[in-house]
């Protein structure tokens, strides 16, 4: 089996589906969901589901977001190599309008602490 190593971000995504993207000063009502995200995590999941042995290297906080990452990686058979740092796990606030366009604000949190040395240690 091929092995893929992905180094990147894990975020807890907070998603609001709204009729239109918010303008400055606007208050909107929308449907809310939360779930996993982050470019690195999404790539690791895609690689694993395509059949590759997958190692995901990331930085996480010591919080519920980190617990979510661990549970999801275990469930998908992803070898998670996380480094716990003194910052919250990354988050993203995502607004998606009726046409599917989005606006995203991220709180990088622990993702900003990811270092090349973490990857070297995982290999």
Predicted regions and their residues:
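Short, solvent-exposed amphipathic alpha-helical segments in soluble enzyme
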Residues: 20-23, 71-75, 122
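A glycine-rich helix N-cap at a beta->alpha junction
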Residues: 72-87
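Conserved phosphate-binding/catalytic loop of the ribokinase/pfkB sugar-kinase fold
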Residues: 59, 81, 94-123
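Short secondary-structure boundary/capping elements
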Residues: 35-42, 85-88, 111-118
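Glycine-rich phosphate/adenosyl-contacting loop at the front of the ribokinase-like
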Residues: 1-59, 66-68
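Active-site-proximal loop->helix
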Residues: 64-76, 94-96, 100
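Short alpha-helical
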Residues: 63-64, 88
